[in-house]
Amino acid sequence: VQTVLDQAGVTGIALDALAVGVGPGPFTGLRAGLATAAALGLAWDVPVHGVRSLDALAHAAGVDAFRHGIEEFVVATDARRREVYWAHYAQVGGQPTLLHGPFVSPADEVTPLPVYGAGAGLYPEALRAVPDWETATPSAVGVGQVAELALRRGRGLVPAEPLYLRESDAKVPGPRKRAGA
């Protein structure tokens, strides 16, 4: 965090707000990022805004979609377990707008539209990948850009809470087995 602030030439107390990716994504990564953002928000007395990771990727992809006349598209990322996290967007006023989702499903259940993101690169037999976007993933820059744009336009953002689309892989251990005497 300090390195990023140093590179930007600012201090934490100079910030007006923080933006954090809320997922969908891996449980541990989401919890770590959200806990860090919440702690920094408290320490610096600034609000913390949530941004869906798929929205961050859609924001980046939207420029390409607009340039190529793609009115509706899907963003998909790796959800592991042979599934993708995905959402369906449309260009509205030159900006991607969420129509449906986010979802988690096997790739062959995704809406048949051009697909931006690493999910398309993983499942080329099921998804119509947009060339040069088959490895794209959400970025911190994209999260910040979506938050800044929404706040400038007076739009709300999602709560800074994890967006889980399925149950955790972690299991609570059952009772201990006792050895027979």
Regions found by a protein language model. Give the residues of each.
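Stable alpha-helical structural segments in soluble proteins, enriched in small hydrophobic residues
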Residues: 4-8, 43, 61-64, 140-153
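DPxDG-like acidic metal-binding loop motif
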Residues: 19-48
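N-terminal beta-alpha supersecondary unit
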Residues: 1-27
